[in-house]
Amino acid sequence: MGNDSSILADGSAMAVPGTSFNHTLFETALPPLPTFSLEVQPDLFPWVSDFWLNLLLPVVVYWVLSLTFHAIDVNDWFPQYRLHTPEEITKRNHVSRFEVARDVILQQIIQVVTGALLALSEPPEMIGKSEYDVAVWATRIRIAQRALPTVLGLVGLNATAISKSLLDTHPLLAGAVAGGYYPSLVGANSEPAFASWEMTLAKTIYYFLIPSVQYFIGAAIIDTWQYFLHRLMHVNKWLYVHFHSRHHRLYVPYAYGALYNHPVEGFLLDTLGAAVAFKVTRMTLRQGILFFSMSTIKTVDDHCGYAFPWDPLQIVTSNNAEYHDIHHQHWGIKTNFAQPFFTFWDTLLDTKYRGSKTNKPGQKKAKVEEKAQ
């Protein structure tokens, strides 16, 4: 293949007679794409299938983390970091711990059934194509380099002179400046090969950047879904009375009450929103395992009732336990709708709590600290 090449939608290289992709200094050929053979991906662990791991790990994570916070709570191990006193949990909450646990288990059953239907709607996940996909990205990187001589020319730089001056000391950089010209890089049968930096960048894009973007978009979808539906349930009196008011029986949140909801609300707000994020971002099943588990951890942490200074989830985002606790108080119930990851929508739509700091949980925490001393 010569420099008149492009990449098809499936990533394969194709010659296009009579056209060129930008101006290059030399006739260049694209390295060939490797062949691949697909096979069904084996399970991550021999003792449990990925199907069941995806369904059950978020439930296990929920209860392990919740019971850890519960142990801290009932043993009063870190009173200085409490948002509320133990007495408040007993006096102000309008639902028993048993009822909370019962309703959470019901929601998790609905969650598992929905997750099973979602997973069964997906085709079997295959492996064996990753090397090919990385090579496709490396090819795109090589083709993108063909624009460099033109770009440099636009700012008055001579790509030919620069490339020649770099050839002895930095041959790979010289090749990039020349528009992706690497005559010394050859593979089997004297075919063109990719530079090491091209492969490293391609692998970084494929294995890190793309999944990171998927996770970020997934989090943004969940935040958007939950913000507007959550806010609607406060604005619409009928929805609040019949569904969302159940969650607000917990004026003093605690960890395993994170998913204490009316079953209809739990399905619409939590389960369906996560399913939409999974589908839209086209995550793999294993990506879903991590995404759903991390979402569960964040949700539990936001309801834990503690403001630990060393908690990474409460450091990296302002949407934390103290932020959400404000929403559970009668003086903050019409604010702080955002959950579970960021506060973007509260900030943009001016629903972030801006009342007196004397009402905030920090005041409760100060009283607890005085009592502990």
Predicted regions mapped to residue ranges:
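Hydrophobic transmembrane alpha-helical segments that form the core helix bundle
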Residues: 115, 119-239, 253-320, 365
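Cytosolic/stromal cytosol-facing helical appendages immediately following the last transmembrane segment
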Residues: 2-44, 48-52, 69-92, 235-373
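Aromatic-acidic/polar surface patches that form glycan- and anion
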Residues: 53, 57, 214, 218, ...
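Extreme N-terminal flexible tails
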Residues: 1-197
